[in-house]
Amino acid sequence: MNTDLKIAQAAVLEPIDKIAQKAGIPEEYLELYGKEKAKVNIKLMETLADKPDGKLVLVTAINPTKAGEGKSTTTIGLADGLAKINKNVMACLREPSLGPVFGLKGGATGGGYAQVVPMESINLHFTGDMHAITTANNLIAAILDNSIFQGNPLNIDPTRVTWKRCLDMNDRTLRDITIAQKKKSNGVEREDHFVITVASEVMAILCLSKDLQDFEKRIGRAVVAYTYDNQPVTVNDIQAAGAATVVMKEAINPNLVQTLEHTPTFIHGGPFANIAHGCNSVIATKMALKLADYVVTEAGFGADLGAEKFLDIKCRLAELNPSAVVVVATIRALKMHGGVEQENLDQPNVEAMLAGAKNLQKHIETVQSFKLPFIVAINKFAKDSKEEVDALLTWCHENNYPVAEADGWAKGGDGMLDLANKVVDITDHACKYQPIYDVNDSIETKITKICETVYGSPHVEFSELTNTKIQDFIKHGWDKLPVCMAKTPLSLSDDPTLKGRPENFVTHITDISVSAGAGFVVVYTGNVLTMPGLPKVPAAVNMGIDESGETYGLF
């Protein structure tokens, strides 16, 4: 079978205005970026206010291998499958970050015959939203440092600047730097830090804003530093909210593309799920719900990260009520959780796979704790043995878990028909999801409830630094915000080497920070990096342009 790139390059795309017409988007709200992609003006929402919402289906997964387990592929394939059974459907995805594209994981446009296109463009720059987010973030940083340099009228303590610069690239050398060295004319020398753009608060704010005016309010209250007398300094205080919003004027509008089978798809926003909240924008999701009867979306990594934040942060804020959850599992990831090493995952091992099913079971229990109907999707890989797939199907049936095989990678929508029909069945029953915690709970209680209910961690240890900051956050009223856990995606615990379903383990809360603009408190567990590094052999070294002008090496 061809590579993802070859399949995408061979695809015949429909003009994007035709895709918009299929989605019910009038031409006057379409802002074309060539023939294959467009932005949809947010003003369209004003005309859709009286339309009922469609059904929202969340795709999540078990704890993944480092290569990922195909949530995007399943999301896209399921949307195509629903379209094939004559449902009015849209998909909502996050925009890929260039860091992982050139690093290790790759893009987020699906795989095989379940892809969104134009694949190359989506993975590389797209409509410029990442650039706008990076620019808005770094504009705030520049205005902040300029204020300190120009007499420091706000009495900012340079050692307590919390706003970090960002770049949409994996570059470990920028994690800890010193700026304004050597000359006083360069500014006030201080320690600084870069995060990857998708971990920035601007990205989170974009994805949680309801419109451009809401974005300006949110960015204005974002905390950038503290004064010498321990008072927070905001973007409004340094008078940068208006300029940052101007930069984001076009980026606030969702991006419209299509799947290989021409299903309309929004791609908008892309916060990391192990650091930020891991969901596409509220704007795109709510617009899709007005346009389609079924909206399929994904949340990053496993249910312990993306799904928890989707339900406890995004849905609570945006007043969304999901109709069902698809839990993606792969034979190879289950074998990893059953003790098989990465290099041996292609070898059949039913015993290890069933041992690793405890990880799947925990994620199912997490979804059940939110009071939502679910179905397990076995995302098939070419090297899965029939014995392994049959054993997993039997395990699901014995535990009364709804299950379907998903073969979108090899067959597109045709490989997702069973899953599509079963998703329709489970969404026919009205449900009301229940968050894990109340926002009025204390910070400690919110964290503990997540650790106990979602991770299965009976013990939570708070560092002295965290306890001190919690008392400070209470004074500012930040203790009533939702919490956004920063944790390794590779384990239910904060230790990436603990596979399966760990028991009797401790979750270590090392630090907290406030994202007052986004509207949550970030809680750090273990050692989480906000600026990734490149692997020993980055994917980038195998990429290029051939003599015919075609890209190669991009998956």
Predicted regions and their residues:
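Flexible phosphate-sensing "switch/lid" loops adjacent to ATP/NTP-binding sites
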Residues: 1-555
